[in-house]
A protein has these predicted regions:
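N-terminal beta-alpha lobe that positions the nucleotide/phosphoryl donor
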Residues: 1-225
């Protein structure tokens, strides 16, 4: 790669640009109408405005791909947030014959739908938390909670969600309906899908993430916690 477009702003865009500079890779930045003086632009070799204000500028797939073509980049790095987990963005880059630095469209679709991702983990014999196999109704969630051990709690999650949105911990079956109603409304507002699934809630555990890097040719490694 000789030139990449960084489809993001702020700290992550600066970090990517610094790494590219160390590797001798030219960078192209983008910015919204109200981000014209943002620090990340000073770290880029070239910068282009996306004619929108605020976060919407960094979510405009059509305009970002157009800039990528115009600037003749080899690849696009989405950073995190914004379009980084959007399968349509990965697909658009592929159609434009520009490498997407991130998971494939297929992988993004699978992991964007949490019950599919969990099903894949089970298929690969990876231990998972006890929970529903897919979206649930109030009746199914109530039955699941009754089958849990005494004094156990349940966590409601958005099928299409992430970042804690559409999530509720329920300690009593009597609170389940209200919690599901609220979680469903929140999930629909955030992810355009009201669907929920449930899992046993594990108390006194930590959320741990592991970064994985693949070369697109079957080789992969991880960076621990």
């Amino acid at each position: 790669m000789k030139k990449i477009l960084i489809a993001n702003r702020g700290e992550i865009a600066i970090r990517i640009a610094r790494t590219c500079n160390d590797l001798g890779i030219k960078t192209v930045g983008i910015y919204s109408e109200d981000d014209s003086s943002s620090l990340h632009l000073s770290k880029m070799d070239e910068s282009f405005i996306v004619d929108e204000k605020g976060a919407n500028a960094y979510l405009n797939i059509k305009k970002i791909i157009s800039i990528a073509k115009l600037s003749k980049v080899d690849a696009i790095h989405p950073g995190y947030g914004f379009l980084s987990e959007n399968p349509s963005f990965a697909s658009a880059a592929k159609r434009a014959k520009i490498k997407f630095i991130g998971p494939s469209e297929r992988s993004l679709k699978i992991f964007g739908e949490k019950t599919q991702a969990k099903g894949l983990a089970e298929k690969l014999s990876i231990p998972v938390i006890e929970g529903s196999k897919g979206k649930v109704t109030l009746r199914q969630a109530t039955a699941f909670m009754k089958d849990l051990k005494k004094n156990s709690s349940l966590v409601i999650k958005a099928v299409a969600g992430g970042g804690g949105r559409g999530m509720r911990v329920v300690n009593s079956a009597g609170d389940l309906k209200e919690a599901m109603d609220r979680a469903s409304s929140e999930a629909e507002a955030a992810f355009n899908s009201p669907e929920l699934y449930v899992e046993e809630y594990l108390k006194n555990y930590r959320h741990v993430e592991v970064q994985v890097l693949g070369d697109g040719k079957g080789q992969a490694t991880h960076f621990h916690e």
